[in-house]
Amino acid sequence: MQEQIEGAVDEELLKQSVLNNDEDDRRLTKLRIERFRTTHTLYIFLYSALAALQFIAIAFFTRGFLLSRKVLDDVANRDESTAPAKFDRLVLLVVDALRFDFVIPVDVAAEGYNSHYHNHLRALYERWDESILLKFLADPPTTTLQRLKGLTTGSLPTFIDAGSNFNGDVIDEDNIIKQMCLNNKTIYFAGDDTWDALFHPYLSNVSMPYESLNVWDLDTVDNGVISFFEDHLLNNPTEKKEWDVLVGHMLGIDHVGHKYGPSHFSMAEKQSQVDGFIRQIIDAVDEDTLLVVMGDHGMDHTGNHGGDSPAELESTLWLYTKRPGTWRRQAPAAYNTTELGRYYRAVNQIDLVPSLSLLLGLPIPFNNLGWPIEELAHDDDEWRLFTRQTLMQLETYRNTSNSITDSSKLKILEELKINANSNSSDAGNYQAILLEMYKDLWARFDYYSIGTGIILLIISLAMLITITRLIPSIVVGQMLSELVPTIIVMPLVSNVCFLGVFYVLRQPAFLQNWLWASLLATAVGIIIGFYVPIFDRYNLTWLVLRFGEELSDYWSRVAAFLITLHALIFTSNSFTIWEDKIVSFSLTTLGMLTLYEFVFLPKRHSTSAILAAALGEKEGTVSGISSGQANSDSLPLGRFARIVGGYHSIVLIVCTRLASLITICREEQGAYCTPTFTLTNNYSFSVMLGCLFLVFATPACIKGYYNVSSSYQAAAPIWIGMLMKSILFVNFIYWELKTFENTSDTHGLNLTIFNLTISRIVVGVSLVAANIGWMMGPLCIKLNVHNNDRRSQQATILGYANAYGAQYFLLVINFFMCILLFNKPLAQLSLFLMCNQLLSILEIFDLLKLKENLIGPVALGLLSYQQFFSTGHQATIPAVQWDMGFILTERITFPFTHLGIVLNTFGPHILCGISVALLTLWKQPPGILRANTLLARVVSNCGMLLIYQTVLCLSTFIWVTNFRRHLMVWKIFCPRFMFAALSLIVTQLVLTFITIAFASGRLIKQIDRMFWK
């Protein structure tokens, strides 16, 4: 025992001697650590200010571009012109995502027939003599909240309303539900809680709203609606009914689409349930009750919606009454069900509002722009009555809004109005032209806000270029004590000046209120506070010349070309829809260029390394690197290094190509794209077998990279060999249970509690426990003592050559494990490939001595976008995987639901944002660079990744503005600009608060303390 204690003491003494534990060094170390801590804090403030500036720029642009129409508060009143009611009561059943081909008969031999969703909802087509079945065309965006607004107001919600699908407020403008309430009708409701959010003041207290956004729950809402109808309609005699309007909104079909896609046996089961329920309602209603069954939108082949493809826009409208002679049909050819109802008669959703108002004897809501459905008038006299009342409402709205001021347009409307009054068959032309005019009017933009946003983003880009490429990183570190205080003070000064001037004089109209004025003042203050110290040291001419010098390097020019190529994609809708292929091609091209560099140009000297050598010889104390080290970096690569580099280039190329095979297609890509990211493929046996393979392959691959630098020591085996393998196995069990749910009939077996428990364990361990362990745990190094003779003992530190990088990558592993859970099986295969791509990129740029070159961050930027597409995403609203928000919870719970969607959508961006520090830290031994120099280089690489993201965001801003009148602006360009803005925001937050604030500073300080140099 005594010998063991003495041996431990001797080893500790040896460690102290190896690490040069001198009292003077300790004192100097403390001072340097304090200086480092101050510098680190100042960097956090600097990048937080840059983030604030860019967020303000995005806010101004978004406010100016995403339209919001002017809503009139007027409410229509009943008068003598109001048509008499044809029905006393209304039963309204909304079946979410009731696509039109779901309800019509489809021949089993017809092209497009699918046994999972065709011919199960027959009730709507069988009662042909007593009902009217129509194709119901929605207006994009096809999200539930926006469709309900259109279905009840008769107006058109704008694109920005799609963002509020999670947060509906009571509709202020006139709507048919409000009119029912004002005309003393009692409204009972059960189903989607969006109704309660929009119409709460008008609904009866007995109403039963249910949470709507938990897309994994197929039955709760539907069963609740059925139970509610049983209590108040099906099992209740007509004379005892206390309601005038009974509304139900079922979600099962929509949720099956989101969870499984339409081609799943659950869709047939859910449609059969709805069919039986409708038949019960038909039997229960009397002649004085109108039954309306309708969908709010359709769904695409993946089961999603939100866009404007025909499958998403074509829904169903069915009106039924037991009273004979109520409807007047058009010619039979108008109701052609062949080719999945392609040529079937269609009406717009906004036409429902005037139609129901006329049938129920209600005033048509004031803001309505719809037109009555012709089949609802049983003769010409009634049709003339309907058209006259609707024309009066439309004319009143036009005169009150006073929006159309163009004399030529007014003349056209007056002529159409005269024709409509004399001939009711021409009345529809007036409404159609008026609707198109208002659509054009509502497409008005706030150019002051748009311009402000673009200018602020351009300036933020210039600021990033200044501190990352034009001024040496070590000099920026020295200037922080001047930059940060002025950046903090100047926004306060500018706020006082702006608000004071606006208060005394007049605030510009586009600022609207003091909040926007304050945001603009803050942005101006940050800009002034940044550039005052810069121009105190440097003049503009010198900075411009430095910019030209930065592009003189071969790899910098390659990086600039790749950034420019990506930014120019958004100049065309054709390029934008194929961005996934272009990005994959760009990353493959980069791999080919590095392979060419290693194989065919072995004597090429790294330009950046030569520059570092020159700086080292001339200004060794400023550059932070010894001249010997710099000169060694500039030497040509040896044969073994070229072989290794060629191998990693091939790995990058192959993994990129394999990942690009996993894709989800945009509608616009048509027959030129075959989707592989499908429900069937995701839960296939081969893919799940691949996920099981990943449990062992991923740790093995990472271990191989660690063994190259002898870094598989101490913490590494615990993290990679034990923790990671265990978490990946638990993750596999989770998705195996999901596969069982998706592909098998569980016979009532509820696996929810198991799934929630597993997911919470994975997130808790990977995101919380593992990161705490990383903060407090050992490094990936081991002290090897040679020769037992105490007088001649020697020691080797295994893992010393990659002490920074190996330890930092453990943090990347933590986030990788967490993000993996929130991605479907095929996406997990892609993320495994990403892990190899990432490590190969680090090895390549270490061998090429390009740790400070722009090409490194650009490569990671390309990787993040390439993996975004190969994990089942596109820059479209329907491609958002909303179901990933319910991995941690059964219902919407902030922040866990939102966290799941963010980690799923932006997982590759988060991983690349954290990993950008590894461009500096990978294969970086302690003692070569000072702590402040190392931190400065990490921050500089973070800034370069932000440059890449900012350029893309700026490009989308400019081109979406340029194409604001383009036919595809809301379908292609606008979603892409929104995604670019969100990508920049996520990257900013990750770089500022994780990479710089949490990870890099902590690790550099920890290693600097340990080695005391």
From Swiss-Prot:
Keyword Membrane: yes
Broad enzyme group: transferase
Pathways involved: Glycolipid biosynthesis; glycosylphosphatidylinositol-anchor biosynthesis
Membrane topology note: Multi-pass membrane protein
The keyword Phosphoprotein is annotated on this UniProt entry: no
Keywords linked to the UniProt accession: Cell wall biogenesis/degradation, Endoplasmic reticulum, Glycoprotein, GPI-anchor biosynthesis, Membrane, Transferase, Transmembrane, Transmembrane helix
Any GO BP: cell wall organization
CDD domains xref list: GPI_EPT_3
Recorded superkingdom: Eukaryota
GO molecular function, one term: mannose-ethanolamine phosphotransferase activity
Transmembrane parts of this sequence: 41-61, 447-467, 484-504, 515-535, 558-578, 582-602, 643-663, 682-702, 715-735, 761-781, 802-822, 825-845, 868-888, 899-919, 943-963, 977-997
EC number: 2.-.-.-
Function per UniProt: Involved in glycosylphosphatidylinositol-anchor biosynthesis. Transfers ethanolamine phosphate to the GPI third mannose which links the GPI-anchor to the C-terminus of the proteins by an amide bond. Involved in cell wall biosynthesis.
Family: Belongs to the PIGG/PIGN/PIGO family. PIGO subfamily.
PANTHER family per UniProt: GPI ETHANOLAMINE PHOSPHATE TRANSFERASE 3 (PTHR23071:SF1), PHOSPHATIDYLINOSITOL GLYCAN (PTHR23071)
Protein name: GPI ethanolamine phosphate transferase 3
Organism: Eremothecium gossypii (strain ATCC 10895 / CBS 109.51 / FGSC 9923 / NRRL Y-1056) (Yeast)
Upper classification of the organism: Eukaryota, Fungi, Dikarya, Ascomycota, Saccharomycotina
